[in-house]
Amino acid sequence: MPGFTCCVPGCYNNSHRDRDLRFYTFPKDPTQREIWLKNISRAGVSGCFSTFQPTTGHRVCSVHFPGGRKTYTIRVPTLFPLRGVNERRSRRGRSRKVSAVVPIITSVVSTANETAPLEEDEEEGDIENTTVVQIGQNGQYIAPVDLTSSGDGSCITAVVSGGEESAVHESCSVADFALCGADHSYSLTTGTTSTELLRKLNEQRDIIALMEIKMKEMKNTIRQLRVTEARLQDELRQREQERERLICANTIIKRKL
């Protein structure tokens, strides 16, 4: 697509398509330029733009400026709809997801180290009737485990004694569930897929922007070569004409002699 494309990660505004927007070049002032690079999260990008230095071909659209336009008072872009590649993902969203799951889990299960204490006068027969059910990653129930077997208390278990539900501690913290099962093979990874996808998307956009710049440079080179070729052909034509004139003049002189 012709025209300028905004170099902000996640922004695809183009000067040819979005004619109502304005596109600004990076400031020449080193301080302002550094602030711009820090705000748009370009500094430190891996890939072909790991040492990103903006040129006249890199523009920032007016969407990222408060008020939709760069002015004397508003000189730095601060509005970004998508998170940059260098910004860490906020942990607030993760805590909300965990807290939303906690009430459901705490209503039926409790950790092994927080199970209801047995009464001292309870007989051994009651203990033998106690079964432990492990809950897998997708919420399915695994085969019951004998209560007498030793456990490290790192997995979530549901204890059913004599057909009655065990007491559940409602004060179980979110951190207990976040840390629970961290050492198991079925524990969830801490990496976020969206961040990786955004990083790869930014790298692809950087490659496309670099190729567009290279194509413009090659077009300018081809245009200059064509102009040079036409000039050389003109000079060659003039030399051929001068050569023909000299030959004609020599022929006339020989005839006179």
Swiss-Prot record:
SUPFAM superfamilies: Glucocorticoid receptor-like (DNA-binding domain). Keywords: Activator, Coiled coil, Cytoplasm, DNA-binding, Metal-binding, Nucleus, Repressor, Transcription, Transcription regulation, Zinc, Zinc-finger. One of its GO terms (cellular component) is nucleoplasm. Pfam families: THAP (PF05485). A zinc finger (THAP-type) spans 6-64. Disruption phenotype: Morpholino knockdown of the protein results in severe craniofacial abnormalities. At 4 days post fertilization (dpf), morphant embryos do not develop the major components of the viscerocranium, including Meckel's cartilage, the ceratohyal and the ceratobranchial cartilages. At 2 dpf, knockdown animals also show structural brain abnormalities. This is THAP domain-containing protein 11. It comes from Danio rerio.
